[in-house]
């Protein structure tokens, strides 16, 4: 965690305290008859746990039915033959309803024929973060008691899917721990880092908490946890500094929260859109960008994990491996998904210095670039290039040899080599497409070539 993390938190906490005076944040929609909305807690009196379980069903997706007792559940639209998804929010600094929750619930109900239960613990998650942390075990016990009522109605443990956001991810882990890891699935959306990075397995989310546990990491250098906590752990853009998020503290609250909340918006986008958010296992982000991890054979036997409501994230092996780090790149806005391509340049002759080449793909309206380096005394340099359009819709590739920094004269270096590319995953060489002729590159000059790849 950066040394200035708490300093930034306290600075922004003062801003939040000032904003909270006379403010309730996002105005909640006018509730329908017999519908219940999230509570709004007072910022200075929000530490007492006061939980609501709000049921949303395909028959009435915009109406939250308050279900507390078994009779409430039986008299509601709850269908015990369907799967059940519990959504647990995290720390609420201002004591308001999460601004994203309505869209999240709607996306879940559109994507799956299921019961959706939102766990409202705005009371108990407000004011000091550390007070909210102290409520995690108590909340986990309350949710466990509630699930017992569902199980009594014939719901199976394996049909329960908990989706926890930030601190809510560890609440979900606590519930799963109470059920000895027999719940169907837990999805952690940027599980909280403060107070949990060094916590024991019993205190935080871990692979033993459900039959399948996945986590999406987007803010590992601030509010999110930096260690793997699931069977599959997605590190989006390396797990930090998400494209499109502010990089200056002067952006205020958005600077603190944007990376952290990107996990939520990514998951919503995966539910709402058909373009896949596919990831690739790798030891670390640097190796992934360098084109060292091109398929999903190890450890997934070619079944690449995918974000969304896909059984076991698309992983089709048993037993499931644990704490596997997988990586993917995204765009700066919804639907976020990109296509990943391996790009390679093969020198005819090795050089006694590093060779840097910028590779740019051009489609009808978008350009995407990456720099690859060929180490000295070697012939091949490669990297991963992310682009919104499928590779078969790329019209041109541009190549530019980066000039050496010479003050006294122009760099007139010329190299000759072969350019090749293939869409990920690269399971064999059959996908590799190379330009038909060797390419001559002169320092600082851009060379363009048509790229003709057939859509399959």
Curated annotation (Swiss-Prot):
Coiled coil: none annotated. One of its GO terms (biological process) is lipid catabolic process. Glycans are attached at residue 34. It is found in: Secreted. GO terms for molecular function: phospholipase A1 activity. The keyword Lipoprotein does not apply. Its EC number is 3.1.1.111. Disulfide bonds join 245-258, 282-293, 296-304. InterPro entries: AB_hydrolase_fold, Lipase, Lipase_LIPH, Lipase_N, TAG_lipase. PANTHER family: LIPASE, PHOSPHOLIPASE A1 MEMBER A. This is Phospholipase A1 member A. It comes from Bos taurus. The lineage of its organism: Eukaryota, Metazoa, Chordata, Craniata, Vertebrata.
């Amino acid at each position: 965690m950066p040394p200035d993390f708490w300093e930034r938190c306290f600075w922004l906490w003062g801003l939040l305290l000032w904003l909270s005076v006379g403010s309730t944040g996002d105005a909640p929609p006018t509730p329908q008859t017999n519908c219940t909305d999230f509570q709004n807690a007072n910022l200075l009196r929000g530490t007492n746990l006061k939980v609501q379980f709000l049921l949303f069903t395909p028959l009435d997706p915009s109406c939250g039915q308050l279900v507390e007792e078994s009779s409430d559940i039986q008299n509601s639209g709850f269908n015990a033959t369907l799967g059940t998804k519990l959504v647990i929010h995290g720390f609420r600094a201002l004591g308001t309803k999460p601004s994203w929750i309505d869209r999240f619930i709607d996306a879940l109900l559109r994507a799956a024929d299921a019961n959706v239960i939102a766990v409202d613990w705005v009371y108990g998650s407000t004011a000091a973060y550390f007070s909210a942390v102290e409520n995690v075990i108590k909340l986990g016990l309350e949710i466990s008691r509630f699930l017992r009522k569902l199980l009594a109605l014939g719901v199976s443990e394996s049909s329960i899917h908990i989706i926890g956001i930030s601190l809510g991810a560890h609440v979900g882990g606590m519930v799963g721990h109470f059920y000895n890891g027999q719940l169907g699935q837990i999805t952690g959306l940027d599980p909280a880092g403060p107070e949990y990075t060094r916590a024991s397995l019993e205190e935080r989310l871990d692979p033993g908490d459900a039959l399948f546990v996945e986590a999406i990491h987007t803010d590992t250098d601030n509010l999110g946890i930096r260690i793997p906590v699931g069977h599959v752990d997605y590190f989006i853009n390396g797990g930090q500094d998400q494209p499109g998020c502010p990089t200056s503290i002067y952006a205020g609250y958005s600077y603190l929260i944007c990376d952290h909340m990107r996990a939520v918006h990514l998951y919503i986008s995966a539910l709402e859109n058909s373009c896949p958010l596919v990831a690739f296992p790798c030891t670390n982000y640097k190796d992934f960008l360098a084109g060292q991890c091109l398929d999903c054979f190890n450890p997934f036997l070619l079944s690449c994990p995918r974000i969304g409501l896909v059984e076991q994230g698309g992983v089709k092996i048993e037993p499931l491996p644990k704490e596997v780090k997988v990586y993917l790149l995204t765009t700066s806005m919804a639907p976020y998904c990109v296509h990943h391509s391996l790009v390679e340049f093969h020198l005819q002759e090795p050089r006694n210095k590093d060779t840097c080449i910028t590779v740019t793909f051009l489609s009808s309206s978008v350009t995407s670039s990456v720099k690859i380096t060929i180490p000295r005394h070697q012939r091949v340099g490669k990297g991963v290039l992310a682009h919104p359009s499928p590779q078969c819709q790329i019209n041109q590739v541009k190549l530019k040899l980066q000039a050496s920094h010479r003050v006294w004269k122009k760099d007139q270096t010329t190299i000759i080599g072969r350019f090749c590319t293939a869409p990920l995953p690269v399971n064999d060489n059959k996908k590799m497409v190379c330009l038909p002729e060797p390419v001559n590159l002169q320092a600082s000059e851009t060379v363009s070539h048509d790229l003709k790849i057939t859509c399959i």
